[in-house]
Amino acid sequence: MDQQLKAVSKFLSYILRHRPEAISLELNAGGWAAISELIQCASKHDHFLSEEIIKEVVVSNDKKRFKLSEDGQYIRANQGHSIRVDLDLLPLTPPDVLFHGTATRFLASIMAKGLLPSGRQHVHLSASYETAIAVGRRHGKPTVLEINAQKMQGDGYLFYRSENGVWLTDHVPAQYFVEVE
């Protein structure tokens, strides 16, 4: 992804996941924004977007952070919101084991409190160890936690999967995970 697309992706993440009000944009209950309104609101705050650039970011983003509506007129972030949105996610049966990547400096707090959403709506989990390591590296020296998702679900915890394959849950108490690296 070139630098311009990366910058637009970061801007869209910030606006659609955390601060739509920063550009006077209103999202609907499902987190959707009209692309035309997004372009107009962004331009009033010196961020110049086009429908073509927005759609290119959606298509080229390797993490599939965004989704377009079927008619191509609306956009939303797939997950990671710190604002309340209803993503219409249905509970699903997760794989027996899921992973969470983090930095080792956060481990003591995580072991004491469990995995918390940390300002987001959900805790983000991965079906792959490799993805969890990559996520952990973004925050420093990585460590990976292996979550017993089968046991959690059996104990009544709900799991969801976002459009881009990230597994989500509200909280992971410490008794359901072990450090594997």
Curated annotation (Swiss-Prot):
Coiled coil start-end: none
InterPro entries per UniProt: Ptrans_KptA/Tpt1, RNA_2'-PTrans_C, RNA_2'-PTrans_KptA, RNA_2'-PTrans_N
Keyword list, A-Z: NAD, Transferase
Enzyme Commission number(s) of this protein: 2.7.1.-
Record Gene3D superfamilies: 3.20.170.30, RNA 2'-phosphotransferase, Tpt1/KptA family, N-terminal domain (1.10.10.970)
Entry GO MF terms: NAD+ poly-ADP-ribosyltransferase activity; tRNA 2'-phosphotransferase activity
One BP term from GO: tRNA splicing, via endonucleolytic cleavage and ligation
Keyword NAD recorded: yes
Taxonomy, superkingdom: Bacteria
Keyword Transferase appears in the UniProt entry: yes
SUPFAM superfamilies reported in the protein's UniProt record: ADP-ribosylation
Family (UniProt): Belongs to the KptA/TPT1 family.
HAMAP family: KptA
Function noted in UniProt: Removes the 2'-phosphate from RNA via an intermediate in which the phosphate is ADP-ribosylated by NAD followed by a presumed transesterification to release the RNA and generate ADP-ribose 1''-2''-cyclic phosphate (APPR>P). May function as an ADP-ribosylase.
Protein name, per record: Probable RNA 2'-phosphotransferase
Gene: kptA
